[in-house]
């Protein structure tokens, strides 16, 4: 599995520990649903102004958010809905954009560590790449159960 993490902000210091949390969150989420490990995910770490612009451009929502997911293939609840033929070694699942600035604000607001918030946002976003959503209440419950299960497996609880 290839995971690319790029930091494009300077408001919050990002160290190797944060990168490791992101990688572990991705791996632990993927392995719940997919047997193969030949996937690729890109993670972009940004500030609030950058993610606000993306949110406005891609979702027509003119406000900052904590995380955005950009899937490449169509999944539904962890199952691929289309046949794909990839000519490369890794199958690109999609891109994740995390506002580290928003994550730091939320960690403080919720009274837990930045590491826990980053892990949560990463797991949440990977679940979106895998076709989970939280628009309907039943879907939200399923997604929240997976989020908590994966975070607990990493030793990250509220």
From Swiss-Prot:
Highest taxon, organism lineage: Bacteria
Its required cofactor(s), as named, are:
Zn(2+)
The listed locations are: Cytoplasm
Cofactor annotation remark:
Binds 1 zinc ion.
Residue numbers binding Zn(2+): 124, 128, 134
Family matches, as InterPro entries: MetalPrtase_cat_dom_sf_prd, YbeY, YbeY_CS
Q: What's the chief localization of this chain?
A: cytoplasm
Name of the featured protein:
Endoribonuclease YbeY
Q: Which organism is it from?
A: Caldicellulosiruptor bescii (strain ATCC BAA-1888 / DSM 6725 / KCTC 15123 / Z-1320)
From the broadest rank down, the organism's phylogenetic lineage runs: Bacteria, Bacillati, Bacillota, Bacillota incertae sedis, Caldicellulosiruptorales
């Amino acid at each position: 599995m290839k995971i690319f993490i790029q930091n494009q902000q300077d408001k919050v210091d990002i160290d190797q520990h944060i990168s490791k949390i992101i990688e572990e969150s991705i791996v632990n989420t993927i392995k719940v649903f997919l047997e193969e490990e030949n996937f690729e995910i890109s993670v972009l770490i940004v500030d609030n102004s950058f993610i606000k612009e993306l949110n406005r451009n891609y979702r027509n929502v003119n406000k900052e958010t904590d995380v955005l997911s950009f899937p490449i293939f169509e999944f539904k609840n962890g199952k691929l809905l289309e046949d794909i033929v990839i000519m490369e070694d890794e199958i690109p699942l999609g891109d994740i954009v995390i506002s580290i600035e928003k994550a730091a604000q939320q960690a403080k607001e919720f009274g837990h560590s930045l590491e826990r918030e980053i892990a949560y946002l990463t797991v949440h976003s990977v679940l979106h790449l895998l076709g989970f959503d939280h628009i309907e209440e039943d879907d939200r419950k399923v997604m929240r159960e997976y989020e908590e299960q994966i975070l607990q497996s990493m030793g990250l609880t509220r």
